[in-house]
Amino acid sequence: MASGRARCTRKLRNWVVEQVESGQFPGVCWDDTAKTMFRIPWKHAGKQDFREDQDAAFFKAWAIFKGKYKEGDTGGPAVWKTRLRCALNKSSEFKEVPERGRMDVAEPYKVYQLLPPGIVSGQPGTQKVPSKRQHSSVSSERKEEEDAMQNCTLSPSVLQDSLNNEEEGASGGAVHSDIGSSSSSSSPEPQEVTDTTEAPFQGDQRSLEFLLPPEPDYSLLLTFIYNGRVVGEAQVQSLDCRLVAEPSGSESSMEQVLFPKPGPLEPTQRLLSQLERGILVASNPRGLFVQRLCPIPISWNAPQAPPGPGPHLLPSNECVELFRTAYFCRDLVRYFQGLGPPPKFQVTLNFWEESHGSSHTPQNLITVKMEQAFARYLLEQTPEQQAAILSLV
């Protein structure tokens, strides 16, 4: 856990100032006349016009200065950038100034501020999240949505908070065995939920930051399946969204994702008509969280599922953690080291049709699979890239 004591990074501060003053790195320059803020070129290494000798020179110089790279070593621009990014973010003497940076131009750059001695920028390794826009008057439906998501949209402090709070248990304390009025005697019965706490990561918790790409993609990938057949896919860039059958006329700023429309006479359409307020989903650096607002019984399977064959049913109006980034990264290290299987990263939600009489067997008519884009990206790394990542951990 990061302590409140300021982290001594005088070498980093002196080195940065010297490099900015030297003018030897294209694009690395002061951003104000008082020389309290500086720019760093931040072009993605995957861009076609990426020039390693120019766009990555500053990051490479830091790796060489720290003795983390010499000619012939594995690794590359993405690894070098990650090292410097983490060093700046952990330091109490630097603070990123996002409003002065430009990431949407041909030559993107970030701006960092040099803080005076004794000024602490905040908890090392954390990022501030813009608060939701406040309005003087909002509809009751919108307020309900935002209140419901408050517990799901957890503070995305990269990995530190997740790792520091592993003792809370993988289930997040949100899964219960009662699904309220939506359950019936013939519907899938929930199992008793037990504590699924796992052993904490043995080693440097901060080192897990190096597993993530310099600009990790926490977008949500959705696959819609009706009666065993894939009928649609979607990618959601926002941190939270709501899965619904029909667009809502409310003033809510939360993104709405519509289920694909089936034929009017299909059983799936009958089930979708009961979706009502739908499902809330939060996808952020902490992981994946869902909240069931509809009356339809929904079972789930995910990396954070409690022990037992299931089915595990989502409680009504409660936030449930289904995927935790910190656990995934821990298991990914073991997989790269040949000490375990590939970590699971996909979440499955099964929507059940209510039973109508003792002879009616509940049907799983709708399935939604979801995952975070960065997880698949990491699992698809080449052996050389895996070795480079392990060298940082």
Swiss-Prot record:
It comes from the Eukaryota. One of its GO terms (molecular function) is DNA-binding transcription factor activity, RNA polymerase II-specific. GO terms for biological process: cell surface receptor signaling pathway; defense response to virus; immune system process; positive regulation of transcription by RNA polymerase II; regulation of transcription by RNA polymerase II; transcription by RNA polymerase II. Gene3D superfamilies: 2.60.200.10, Winged helix-like DNA-binding domain superfamily/Winged helix DNA-binding domain (1.10.10.10). SMART domains: IRF, IRF-3. (Microbial infection) Ubiquitinated by Herpes simplex virus 2 E3 ubiquitin ligase ICP22. Residues 9-116 bind DNA. Its main location: cytoplasm. GO terms for cellular component: chromatin; cytoplasm; cytosol; ISGF3 complex; nucleoplasm; nucleus. Changing R292C: Decreased transcriptional activation in response to type I interferon stimulation. Changing K81R: Loss of transcriptional activation in response to type I interferon stimulation. Impaired anti-viral immunity. It is found in: Cytoplasm; Nucleus. Pfam families: IRF, IRF-3. It is linked to Immunodeficiency 65: An autosomal recessive immunologic disorder characterized by recurrent viral infections from early infancy. Clinical consequences are pneumonia, bronchiectasis, and septic shock. Affected individuals have lymphopenia or hypogammaglobulinemia, particularly during infection, and impaired cellular type I interferon response. Patients may have adverse response to vaccination with live attenuated vaccines. Transcription factor that plays an essential role in anti-viral immunity. It mediates signaling by type I IFNs (IFN-alpha and IFN-beta). Following type I IFN binding to cell surface receptors, Jak kinases (TYK2 and JAK1) are activated, leading to tyrosine phosphorylation of STAT1 and STAT2. IRF9/ISGF3G associates with the phosphorylated STAT1:STAT2 dimer to form a complex termed ISGF3 transcription factor, that enters the nucleus. ISGF3 binds to the IFN stimulated response element (ISRE) to activate the transcription of interferon stimulated genes, which drive the cell in an antiviral state. Belongs to the IRF family. PANTHER family: INTERFERON REGULATORY FACTOR, INTERFERON REGULATORY FACTOR 9. This is Interferon regulatory factor 9. The gene is IRF9.
